[in-house]
Design a protein with these regions (language model features):
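N-terminal glycine-/serine-/threonine-rich phosphate-binding loop
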Residues: 1-53
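A short secondary-structure junction signal
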Residues: 125, 160-166, 215-219, 254
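Glycine-rich beta-strand-to-loop/alpha-helix junction loops that act as flexible
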Residues: 55-60, 152-156, 208
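ATP/nucleoside-binding phosphotransfer catalytic cores, i.e., glycine-rich phosphate-binding loops
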Residues: 2, 201-255
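A glycine- and small-aliphatic-rich helix-loop capping segment at beta-alpha/alpha-beta transitions
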Residues: 66-75, 98-102, 165-174
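Short, conserved loop/helix-junction motifs that constitute active-site signature segments
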Residues: 71-79, 106, 169-170, 195-200, ...
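Ligand-binding beta-strand-loop-alpha-helix segment within the catalytic cores
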Residues: 2-12, 76-151
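Class I SAM-dependent methyltransferase SAM-binding "motif I" and its flanking Rossmann-like core
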Residues: 150-195
């Protein structure tokens, strides 16, 4: 067996297990590059639209972005956006958009849609403005927008994007992008909702580290009555691939 990657299926989940974080970053970057190249080629041969790619925040994708920065990717054919964001100034140290820009997109040449933060603008208003930007930028059909690729992560509590356990955002069905309060005293979050994630052509979830192992095991082999938010990504039509390192997969009882 190739020790860099183990490819298995667990129920509806397509799972790719990499030996360590470096192998995960390399493998994820290769998959993302291949996907973007194919979709940009198809788009240019069809209507010339930009390929819509949601970028993940958090710490796990940083190494993947470093790999992507060295690869031959037709970024001029891409419109990137943030799958979720803290509602903070665009240069704030906690901003996902700032991290994504520094790590990759500031020098890549892609169109990059950032959340329209303003000190006097409520988070709900910013979410509505950003949703309008996304709708104008991506393809779709009569049922709604169709993002091409969504990159996401997963927290130790099983959240993905800014869809947290117990959050009202889990039940939103009439918005593609929404504002949600995670905890009192913390910045509001803006996030893609399940209706938008379920419309994607593909979703890649990157998970790294032993601290994520219990949540990943519960997501992929649930034992409780209430599925963790990350599992609900698989309730739609979008194919979801779980790209994980062996430490995160420790609870899956792999051979």
């Amino acid at each position: 067996m190739n020790r860099t990657q183990q490819h298995i299926t667990i129920g509806p989940a397509d799972v790719r297990v990499f030996e360590d974080g470096a192998a995960l970053a390399a493998g994820a970057a290769a998959m993302i590059t291949s996907f973007i190249r194919q979709e940009v080629t198809k788009a240019r041969e069809a209507d010339g639209r930009l390929v819509s790619v949601a970028m993940a925040g958090g710490s796990t994708p940083v190494a993947t972005y470093g790999r992507l920065a060295t690869m031959d990717i037709p970024w001029s054919g891409v419109c990137a956006w943030v799958g979720d964001e803290r509602y903070v100034p665009p240069d704030h140290e906690d901003s996902n958009g700032a991290m994504i820009g520094r790590s990759l997109l500031d020098s890549a040449g892609a169109r990059f849609l950032r959340v329209p933060w303003a000190a006097d603008r409520p988070a709900h208003e910013a979410a509505a403005l950003y949703e309008a930007d996304l709708l104008a930028s991506m393809g779709g059909d009569a049922r709604g927008p169709r993002p091409d690729l969504i990159l996401a992560g997963m927290g130790g509590d099983g959240h993905t994007l800014s869809l947290f356990p117990g959050s009202e955002a889990l039940d939103i069905t009439d918005r593609w992008y929404a504002a949600t309060e995670v905890a009192a005293g913390q910045p509001w979050r803006l996030t893609a909702t399940y209706p938008l994630a379920h419309r994607a052509t593909a979703v890649y979830v990157l998970v790294s580290g032993e601290s994520k192992a219990p949540a990943l095991a519960e997501v992929l082999r649930p034992t409780g009555d209430q599925p963790l938010p990350a599992r609900r990504l698989m309730e739609g039509a979008a194919p979801v691939s779980w790209l994980v390192d062996r430490a995160a997969a420790a609870g899956l009882d792999l051979p």
